[in-house]
């Protein structure tokens, strides 16, 4: 019997790892992921130098990350998108570190003009969740349509007509907006 106790404790210790919960550092970014994709999503943590550490390797194309460290973001700010957009996200983070609003926009405009603006994957979805905390955060979903215009899509470039519309038409930032929260 005395030999059985250490063996039983060892088995329980090993089995406990199989049922362990994710850390808050992983669960927090996954809040923005669609339920049917979250389990298989990759989770990364951005570093100040524009690189990232992989906290959880996923098996689908969705990558999620916390962005509440960026200037002007609320206390709870997480986002998920296609792994194909990581270079775009890195560039966005670089621009977001520019505190002055006018200088920030000028840096983006200059990159658009000189062709160095990284394009997102056409048709990729961006799931963003922002608010003072997770309980009060709101979802915002957009679909990247780099270069899309009203002529190429037939969609308006403003929300006044109702329905879906293209924001930032004709740029690499062009994306489909939908009404609602």
Locate predicted features.
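Intrinsically disordered, low-complexity, hydrophilic segments
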Residues: 5, 19-20
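N-terminal signal peptide c-region/cleavage motif recognized by signal peptidases
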Residues: 15-17
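Primary mode marks residue(s) on the alpha4-beta5-alpha5 output face of response regulator receiver
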Residues: 21-181
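Bacterial N-terminal signal peptides that target proteins for export
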Residues: 1-8
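Repetitive helical segments and hydrophobic/amphipathic motifs
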Residues: 11-12
């Amino acid at each position: 019997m005395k030999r059985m106790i250490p063996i039983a404790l060892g088995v329980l210790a090993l089995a406990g790892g199989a049922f362990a919960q994710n850390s808050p550092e992983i669960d927090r970014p996954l809040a923005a992921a669609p339920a049917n994709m979250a389990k298989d999503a990759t989770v990364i943590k951005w570093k100040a130098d524009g690189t990232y550490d992989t906290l959880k390797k996923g098996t689908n194309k969705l990558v999620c990350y916390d962005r509440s460290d960026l200037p002007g973001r609320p206390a709870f700010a997480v986002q998920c998108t296609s792994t194909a957009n990581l270079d775009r996200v890195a560039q966005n983070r670089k621009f977001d570190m520019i505190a002055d609003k006018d200088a920030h926009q000028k840096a983006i405009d200059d990159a658009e003009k000189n062709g160095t603006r990284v394009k997102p994957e056409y048709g990729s979805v961006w799931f963003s969740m922002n608010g003072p905390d997770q309980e009060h955060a709101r979802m915002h979903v957009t679909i990247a349509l780099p270069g899309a215009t009203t002529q190429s899509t037939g969609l308006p470039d403003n929300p006044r007509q109702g329905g879906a519309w293209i924001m930032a038409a004709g740029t690499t930032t062009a994306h489909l907006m939908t009404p609602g929260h």
